[in-house]
């Protein structure tokens, strides 16, 4: 009997990599997707050494055609996905809205919103047909309230909340479950990407506080997926201990 299958987008680092590891540890077959083929191959090797079956799909969620072709390439017994983790996402820049970079905006909107919608649209119909499945979207505390310079990124994560809530309504007459996990400060390469490789500026984001790790969010995702079928963990806000919300953080010396 085939094990359950999870598909994780943006699995080459951070929360996505953590989810791939946690679900593999929990007995799932794992489909990992991302843009970096070398990193995917490395993770696949590590997970297979632990006894997991793993398939890698290299594509950018912004490329709808590539996503469709990648999913079509899956072997027959891998085509039904029990858990979809829409993790791929990023922040770019921290400029005032009136000085924002158009390319940064496009990348955030196309990845965080349209990429998530693409994967949902391609995978969820099969879940509905089987009357079984779980969609876990990785949102953010940033979707609850805007912060200085966060304008468009915050808007994309507010959209993730609305999209997640809307999907939950759409599948309420099925046995599907839909979860929005909203992390606070997580130490990944997120800030390095936001600041276009400025590592010093990125490191300052985590200065004076013990941030969350990707594995912490992965544990929450696995908990939600492991709940009894009649239990739907609809939304979870996960913050570092010294973080009160999206903007209030106590930093030690």
Specify the residue positions occupied by each region the protein language model found:
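The beta1-alpha1 cofactor-binding region of Rossmann-like NAD(H)/NADP(H)-dependent oxidoreductases
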Residues: 37-38, 58-69, 102
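Residue(s) in the substrate-gating loop at a strand-loop-helix junction
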Residues: 140
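Alpha-helical segment proximal to the catalytic Tyr-Lys
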Residues: 125, 169-172
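Conserved glycine-rich cofactor-binding loop
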Residues: 12-14
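Substrate-binding pocket helix/loop in short-chain dehydrogenase/reductase
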Residues: 95-97, 101-109
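Active-site helix of classical SDR
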Residues: 120, 156
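C-terminal helical subdomain
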Residues: 180-184, 188, 200-247
């Amino acid at each position: 009997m085939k094990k359950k299958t999870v598909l994780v987008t943006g699995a080459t680092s951070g929360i996505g990599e953590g989810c791939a590891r946690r679900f593999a540890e929990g007995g799932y077959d794992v489909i990992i997707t991302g843009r970096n083929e070398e990193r995917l191959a490395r993770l696949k090797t590590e997970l297979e050494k632990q006894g997991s079956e793993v398939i890698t799909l290299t594509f950018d969620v912004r490329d709808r055609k590539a996503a469709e072709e990648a999913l079509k390439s899956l072997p027959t017994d891998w085509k039904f996905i029990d858990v979809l983790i829409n993790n791929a996402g990023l922040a770019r820049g921290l400029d005032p809205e009136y000085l924002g970079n158009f390319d940064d905006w496009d990348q955030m909107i196309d990845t965080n919103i349209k990429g998530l919608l693409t994967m949902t649209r391609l995978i969820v119909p099969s879940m509905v047909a089987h009357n079984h499945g779980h969609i876990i979207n990785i949102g953010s505390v940033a979707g609850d309230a805007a912060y200085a310079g966060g304008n468009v990124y915050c808007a994309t994560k507010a959209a993730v909340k609305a999209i997640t809530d809307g999907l939950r309504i759409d599948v309420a007459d099925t046995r599907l479950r839909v979860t929005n996990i909203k992390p606070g400060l997580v130490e990944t390469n997120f800030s390095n990407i936001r600041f276009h490789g400025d590592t010093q500026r990125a490191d300052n984001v985590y200065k004076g506080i013990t941030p969350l790790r990707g594995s912490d969010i992965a544990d929450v995702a696995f908990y939600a997926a492991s709940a009894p079928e009649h239990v739907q963990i609809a939304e979870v806000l996960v913050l570092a201990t010294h973080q009160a919300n999206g903007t209030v953080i106590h930093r030690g010396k």
